[in-house]
Amino acid sequence: MIFREVLRPPIWVLAFIYFLFLSVVLSVWAAFDNQATLITLALSTMATVWIAHAMKSEITFDGHILRIDQANIEVQYLTNVRVLDKSEMRLLRTRDADPAAYLAIKFWEPQGVRIDLSDPRDKTPYWLITSKRGEEIAALLNR
């Protein structure tokens, strides 16, 4: 494995989700008994742990194949890799987005990488990837 990056949700996102669950727990406590409240609290805690796991994203590159979560592409189909700053990423996520593009973006991370593709079997023009280590990905893929 040449490159591996795991993007996990920040603690403030998980805390916000958990506080939403706690409002449900409080409502259950007001309407029912303590046993129902404890069950709801346990389920809410387990749901938050599951959500934290489900929200993570993994980028790997082994020298031949770039994998982002379930998507993968061979390096021979990559044409141009460009690191995007905060403002470029914001525009490409919204106004300038191509509906056919593959988006592997996380709202809590403002920077990323645009990877242009040239696969004749695939109409996807580019991948837009959220990454904290965009410079490193670009250096590896532009070789």
What are these language model-derived features?
Residues 21, 41-44:
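Alpha-helical transmembrane segments of integral membrane proteins
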Residues 32-41:
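Short, aromatic-rich membrane-interface segments at the entry and exit
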Residues 69-128:
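Non-transmembrane, membrane-adjacent beta-strand/coil modules in membrane-associated proteins
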